[in-house]
């Protein structure tokens, strides 16, 4: 399995193809944000979640 999941730039759907099968748009690698134990924005995210 050498393929990685990709996300369409136009419609936001996920696929393994270079071109979106739904809208025909360009797809980009869907790379998640890097995890850091020393999360500098964790405090703000928890405050926003609390409301």
UniProtKB/Swiss-Prot annotation:
SUPFAM superfamilies: Nop10-like SnoRNP (SSF144210)
InterPro entries per UniProt: H/ACA_rnp_Nop10, H/ACA_rnp_Nop10_sf, Nop10_arc-typ
GO CC annotation: ribonucleoprotein complex
GO molecular function: snoRNA binding
Pfam families for this protein: Nop10p (PF04135)
Any one Gene Ontology BP term: rRNA processing
Record keywords, A-Z: Ribonucleoprotein, Ribosome biogenesis, rRNA processing
Superkingdom in the source lineage: Archaea
Function: Involved in ribosome biogenesis; more specifically in 18S rRNA pseudouridylation and in cleavage of pre-rRNA.
Family, similarity comment: Belongs to the NOP10 family.
Name of the featured protein: Ribosome biogenesis protein Nop10
Gene: nop10
């Amino acid at each position: 399995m050498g393929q990685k999941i990709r996300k369409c730039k136009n419609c936001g759907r996920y696929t393994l193809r270079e071109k979106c099968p739904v809208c025909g748009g360009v797809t980009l690698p869907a790379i998640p944000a890097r995890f850091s134990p020393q999360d500098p924005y964790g405090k703000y995210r928890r405050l926003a979640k609390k409301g």
